[in-house]
Amino acid sequence: MSPQTETKASVGFKAGVKDYKLTYYTPEYETKDTDILAAFRVTPQPGVPPEEAGAAVAAESSTGTWTTVWTDGLTSLDRYKGRCYGIEPVPGEDNQYIAYVAYPLDLFEEGSVTNMFTSIVGNVFGFKALRALRLEDLRIPTAYVKTFEGPPHGIQVERDKLNKYGRPLLGCTIKPKLGLSAKNYGRACYECLRGGLDFTKDDENVNSQPFMRWRDRFLFCAEAIYKAQAETGEIKGHYLNATAGTCEEMLKRAVFARELGVPIVMHDYLTGGFTANTSLSHYCRDNGLLLHIHRAMHAVIDRQKNHGMHFRVLAKALRMSGGDHIHSGTVVGKLEGEREITLGFVDLLRDDFIEKDRSRGIYFTQDWVSLPGVLPVASGGIHVWHMPALTEIFGDDSVLQFGGGTLGHPWGNAPGAVANRVALEACVQARNEGRDLATEGNEIIREATKWSPELAAACEVWKEIKFEFQAMDTLDTDKDKDKKR
């Protein structure tokens, strides 16, 4: 290269490494209505200032790289770069900060959760300058929300399809989750459905294994549904898990379910992936199928408080990608779920508009405009004694799913289903009469046992069962103040 050429090429470009905060930390920035806003919990490495750490997150999740490159001059960084516009310390933690980052909408493909996450929670999570990084919340602007179809049907359409109103829906996961033959599996479904449940469910890891191929399971479960419907006069369903190794196979299973005339299929959206989930959601919308979503693998992502991604973000992403139900924790059962935090993302699933409320972990006001809502599913270690609390916590627009709490009944599956249905109806009636489920719940259940021997037997079996472990997912508080209290 001649000296003249070298001089021209280097005009306005200075090679080397410079601090991220010089370009990407902009505390004076005023966010736009069209920006995607993110709240990251940042734990910098020793010696890294929080402003530099926050700016590094903004850079590495948008336009930046580790060094200055000459092609920066071929585009408008001010238009496309992410901006860290705020840093605040986390109460009670010595070296944790909440970094607020704004992303221009043009960085993201329309209608693609996959593309959104590839940028926002991509390589930046392995960045050496950070000891740990967690995405706590996202604000999805209405301009971006409108590029998604969202849930195939939504809460009201599902109730109309099922002709069931004024109470939570009842479900049961068939156990043992693996090992049953298709015929025995179908028989277990039938017993639960005729006993009074609305749904039975494939467990998340039931796909198409040697002991029970998917087509056989679909056929026997469809038979169980139609037989139970004929006997009870109620519409019934079974969550037929269409999750498969390829998108083509997944859709083939969904097509077969539609041909059988069943009302609902299921997908493991995290292990299956957002691209597959959105494709299945579009198919279900076009073909009148409800879509139940299981969150298997979520705890790998959201369990640690200082690294990963909070479930409220995964819940928002699911509402965008599409699903009519999603598991959301129970507050009272065996699986993770602190009450205020759980209710925060339950509202994010169901409501049209949710105000910022840090007391429930909600960092941003979220407007879903016309996107349909998702029913939260309470499942995991729950039984009849939990029914008053579950009814009070989750309200009518929910699915209460008892696996062992149905199938573990000493008299069998159908009596287990009867016990749960009676307990639910008793709680709903008591609530409608103005009684306080939180304080009178046990009394309400005991009164109902007088006219339901099935419920009485269930209450006796599970009277001592408790899951007394501290939740990992808790709200941030000042630890020194807590000790003084």
Swiss-Prot record:
Prodomain residues? 1-2
Q: Which SUPFAM superfamilies match?
A: RuBisCo, C-terminal domain, RuBisCO, large subunit, small (N-terminal) domain
The family database entries (CDD domains) matched by this protein are listed as:
RuBisCO_large_I
Protein's GO biological process: photorespiration; reductive pentose-phosphate cycle
GO molecular function list: magnesium ion binding; monooxygenase activity; ribulose-bisphosphate carboxylase activity
Q: Where is this site: Transition state stabilizer?
A: 334
Q: Which UniProt keywords apply?
A: Acetylation, Calvin cycle, Carbon dioxide fixation, Chloroplast, Disulfide bond, Lyase, Magnesium, Metal-binding, Methylation, Monooxygenase, Oxidoreductase, Photorespiration, Photosynthesis, Plastid
Q: Which residues carry this modification: N-acetylproline?
A: 3
Which top-level enzyme class is recorded in the Swiss-Prot or TrEMBL entry?
A: lyase
Residues where N6-carboxylysine is found: 201
PTM annotation (N6,N6,N6-trimethyllysine): residues: 14
Q: How is the cofactor bound?
A: Binds 1 Mg(2+) ion per subunit.
What do the Gene Ontology cellular component annotations say?
Answer: chloroplast
The record's annotation in Pfam families points to:
RuBisCO_large (PF00016), RuBisCO_large_N (PF02788)
Query: Where in the cell does this protein reside?
Result: Plastid, Chloroplast
The UniProt record gives the binding positions of Mg(2+) as 201, 203-204
Post-translational modification, briefly?
Answer: The disulfide bond which can form in the large chain dimeric partners within the hexadecamer appears to be associated with oxidative stress and protein turnover.
What cofactor is needed? Answer: Mg(2+)
Record's function text: RuBisCO catalyzes two reactions: the carboxylation of D-ribulose 1,5-bisphosphate, the primary event in carbon dioxide fixation, as well as the oxidative fragmentation of the pentose substrate in the photorespiration process. Both reactions occur simultaneously and in competition at the same active site.
Q: Which family does it belong to?
A: Belongs to the RuBisCO large chain family. Type I subfamily.
Query: What's the subunit arrangement here?
Result: Heterohexadecamer of 8 large chains and 8 small chains; disulfide-linked. The disulfide link is formed within the large subunit homodimers.
- The protein's name: Ribulose bisphosphate carboxylase large chain
- State the organism named in the record: Flaveria pringlei
Top-level taxonomy: Eukaryota, Viridiplantae, Streptophyta, Embryophyta, Tracheophyta
Gene (name only):
rbcL
